[in-house]
Curated annotation (Swiss-Prot):
Substrate binds at R104, D141. One of its GO terms (biological process) is diaminopimelate biosynthetic process. Pathway: Amino-acid biosynthesis; L-lysine biosynthesis via DAP pathway; LL-2,6-diaminopimelate from (S)-tetrahydrodipicolinate (succinylase route): step 1/3. This is 2,3,4,5-tetrahydropyridine-2,6-dicarboxylate N-succinyltransferase. The lineage of its organism: Bacteria, Pseudomonadati, Pseudomonadota, Gammaproteobacteria, Enterobacterales. It comes from Yersinia pestis. GO terms for molecular function: 2,3,4,5-tetrahydropyridine-2,6-dicarboxylate N-succinyltransferase activity; nucleotidyltransferase activity. Homotrimer.
Length: 274
């Protein structure tokens, strides 16, 4: 694996000079192999090690390099044709392979090669970009978008129109992460490498980036870039120091544990916030 990483790191330093016509065989094969490993879930751009999320920057570099080594080409779809550098994940799938891998794909859901989809996942008409990881039992609902290299945990529900941001540029940014057993309400956006920790519930229409204040009304604490585990979050506003205006924020209205979540429906958690 170290040899593979070295090839990617070296190629990335001269990425501006790489084209589909001049890329050498070793570099092309290394990039293609990494994309295949991401596609099968053997590698992932970020993983939790000793309780902390670690981003493997060299894998993100490989994803970026993949755009340098391929020309656009026509791709056939059920309703239309496409013209892009990145092939579709399911282009070579037959019924046996779909059954073997154990997920559902509802037309016209689109997944790019290099994204991993785990068993028992349901993809409604949605979009999953290259480098993303979608774990077991997750629902990606209609018109939801899972951005490049985003990490989606087990038993997550991404509601209709949800946007999970991609972070290939800038390269130093960490991917957006939704941990296990989270619910993200319709039309919400989580971007810029924000981490939504396990068991959290994000209400409809909540927008969270790195600069968004995440206000815990019970403690008065303000978080940036992280929604603590078990949080129930709605959109809100915080006043300026002089009280002359207010600015948008996300508000943690309560905390719940797994036992409470198992007994109480999502809608009930969001209704009882007073």
């Amino acid at each position: 694996m170290q040899q593979l990483q070295n090839v990617i790191e070296t190629a990335f330093e001269r990425r501006a000079d790489i084209t589909p016509a001049n890329v050498d065989t070793v570099t092309r094969e290394a990039i293609t192999h990494v994309i295949d490993l991401l596609d099968t879930g053997a590698l992932r751009v970020a993983e939790k090690i000793d309780g902390q999320w670690v981003t493997h920057q060299w894998l993100k570099k490989a994803v970026l390099l993949s755009f340098r080594i391929n020309d656009n080409q026509v791709m056939e779809g059920a309703e239309t044709r496409y013209y892009d550098k990145v092939p579709m994940k399911f282009a070579g799938y037959d019924e046996a392979r779909f059954q073997r891998e154990g997920f559902r794909v509802v037309p016209p859901a689109t997944v790019r090669k290099g994204a991993f989809i785990a068993r028992n996942t349901v993809l409604m008409p949605s979009y999953v970009n290259i480098g993303a990881f979608v774990d077991e039992g997750t629902m990606v609902d209609t018109w939801a978008t899972v951005g490049s290299c985003a990490q989606i945990g087990k038993n997550v529900h991404l509601s209709g129109g949800v946007g999970i941001g991609g972070v290939l540029e800038p390269l130093q940014a960490n991917p957006t992460i939704i941990e296990d057993n989270c619910f993200v309400g319709a039309r919400s956006e989580v971007v810029e490498g924000v981490i939504v920790e396990e068991g959290s519930v994000i209400s409809m229409g909540v927008f969270i980036g790195q600069s968004t204040r995440i206000y815990d009304r019970e403690t008065g604490e303000v978080h940036y870039g992280r929604v603590p585990a078990g949080s129930v979050v709605v959109s809100g506003n915080l006043p300026s120091k002089d009280g002359s205006y207010s600015l948008y924020c996300a508000v943690i209205v309560k905390k719940v544990d797994a036992k409470t979540r198992s007994k109480v429906g999502i809608n009930e958690l969001l209704r009882t916030i007073d």
